[in-house]
Amino acid sequence: MTKKYSLGFVGRKAGMSRIFTEDGRSVPVTLIEATPNRIAQIKTVEVDGYSAVQITVGARRAALVNKPAAGHFAKAKVEAGRGLWEFRVEDAHLGDFAVGGEIKADIFEVGQKVDVQGVTKGKGFQGTIKRYNFRMGDATHGNSLSHRAPGSLGQRQTPGRVFPGKKMSGHMGAVQQSTQNLEVVKVDVERGLIAIHGAVPGAAGGDVIVRPASKA
């Protein structure tokens, strides 16, 4: 597939490496495993109310696929993957896709700007210093109870409550995040790899969505 679309591509973060340019510069890159995305459904305005391409990627054991999903994949004659993703596509371009077809990494080209979406690393329950970069209290000089305490949570009897959104201790990480305007450094369709300049959200092994940059 040589045409360029605004739809995304689901890959898996493999880790980070570096690539040397012809002039000897070291470029840090994130390697994305870009196995072909299989088209499981074409959604149209007439039937679904909007136009989109639904894809799956990877493989999942039959024992782990529930009956509705198994029926969905069987109807499309597509091998069950590890999930389903949808990408909006203009109605005029739906004819370029077919159920059972594949979308490969060659929808991207070297030098193209992309946005990468993933789930950040989960850190569990964390205090305000790690979670929000609060300043620590004095280590000495009479301070014995509030080295890592967040400090005041509000005022007094008026307003008599803690305002919503107050930065406090709590769950950190494991949220969906996008990094924008990253450059594609290399695309290797045969090996199924995309090299992207810089870091992308999430841990190695996590699913990421690569799509053309919205603000390029």
UniProtKB/Swiss-Prot annotation:
Question: Pfam families attached here?
Answer: Ribosomal_L3
Describe its PTM?
A: Methylated by PrmB.
Q: Which Gene3D superfamilies match?
A: 3.30.160.810, Translation factors
Return one GO MF term.
Answer: rRNA binding
Q: Which GO terms describe its cellular component?
A: cytosolic large ribosomal subunit
| Highest rank taxon of the organism | Bacteria
N5-methylglutamine modification, residue list? 157
For this UniProt record, give its keywords in alphabetical order, as a comma-separated list.
Methylation, Ribonucleoprotein, Ribosomal protein, RNA-binding, rRNA-binding
GO biological processes: translation
Family according to the record: Belongs to the universal ribosomal protein uL3 family.
Biological function: One of the primary rRNA binding proteins, it binds directly near the 3'-end of the 23S rRNA, where it nucleates assembly of the 50S subunit.
Give the HAMAP family listed for this entry.
Answer: Ribosomal_uL3_B
Subunit details:
Part of the 50S ribosomal subunit. Forms a cluster with proteins L14 and L19.
Tell me what this protein is called.
Large ribosomal subunit protein uL3
**What's the source species for this entry?**
Xanthomonas oryzae pv. oryzae (strain KACC10331 / KXO85)
Phylogenetic placement of the source organism: Bacteria, Pseudomonadati, Pseudomonadota, Gammaproteobacteria, Lysobacterales
